[in-house]
C-alpha cells in the first residue's frame, strides 16, 4: 500500500494563496458587482430618490472624478493634515484611481451625493472587501444612505466570497467611529 504524501506548510500556504487570488480575480473580473443585487440599486428618503451605481475607478467620467477629489478634500483634508500621514493631493488622487479600485456612487437627478472607494483584496491573509472611503455630501448625512451603502458593500463582499469588510478610521473622526461601531 502506498502512503499518501502530506503537503508541507509551505505547499498549504501556497495553495491557500492561489485560491484567494482566484477569488480576488473573479470579483475584479465582474463588470458590475452591484448588478445582481437589485435591492441596492435605489434608496428612497423623504427628500430624495437616490440611485446607486458601481463602476471601476478607471471608467469614471471626468466630472465624477473631479467631484470625488473635491469631496475628499472638503471632508478629509483636515483629518489627514492632523495625522502623521499628512495630506498629499497627488498621492490621494493616485490611490483613488488605482487600477483595482471600484466606486459605489450615490446620485440623484445627476447630482453626486456620496461615494465609496473600495477594492477586493487580501488583508492579513484574508480575502476582503477593503472600504477605503465612504464620503457623503453634508445635506444627505444622517438619512440612512451611509448605512445603506455599507449594506451594499457587505452584500457585494458576501456575494464574492470575501470573508469580511475592512476599513480604517482616523482616531479623531469620532462621528465615523460611532457610525461604524453601530454597524458592528
Where are each of the predicted segments found?
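Acyl-donor-binding surface of acyltransferase catalytic domains
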Residues: 1-51
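Acetyl-CoA-dependent GNAT
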Residues: 20, 26, 39, 43, ...
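Polytopic endomembrane small-metabolite transporters, centered on the Drug/Metabolite Transporter
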Residues: 80-82, 160, 171
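Conserved beta-strand-loop-alpha-helix junction that forms the acyl-donor binding cleft
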Residues: 134, 167-177
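Active-site acidic-Proline motif in GNAT/NAT acetyltransferases
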Residues: 137-143, 171-172
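Conserved acetyl-CoA-binding loop-helix of GNAT-fold acetyltransferases
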Residues: 142-155, 178-182
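Conserved GNAT acetyl-CoA-binding A-motif
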Residues: 157-168
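Structural motif
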Residues: 160, 182-184
